[in-house]
A protein has these predicted regions:
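Residue-level preference for short coil/turn positions at secondary-structure junctions
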Residues: 1-2, 62
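C-terminal structural segments of small proteins and small subunits
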Residues: 49-84
Length: 84
């Protein structure tokens, strides 16, 4: 399992993803954004899953960025624009 961190453009994205993850029975945590990262809404979601599975949880227009987590290191995998 790999841990991924999702940042969102707003708290609406956090709430939508949390509900979807709960419904799927996924292992996740909602936390404050780490200090070394910047985010609009102040909250993020840590998701533990097999590499590749994180892609299905990207919410177009809601997800701002996706990171792979290794200890205190965050590797940026992708950034996404807000929905117009």
């Amino acid at each position: 399992m790999t841990t991924f961190l999702f940042l969102f453009h707003s708290t609406v994205g956090v709430v939508r993803m949390r509900k979807a993850l709960q419904a799927a029975g996924a292992s996740f945590r909602v936390k404050d954004i780490p200090r070394q990262l910047r985010g609009v809404c102040g909250l993020c979601i840590y998701l533990s899953c097999e590499p590749g599975e994180e892609q299905k949880w990207i919410l177009p227009g809601q997800t701002a960025a996706l990171f792979r987590v290794a200890g205190d290191d965050y590797q940026l995998l992708a950034q996404f624009p807000p929905q117009a």
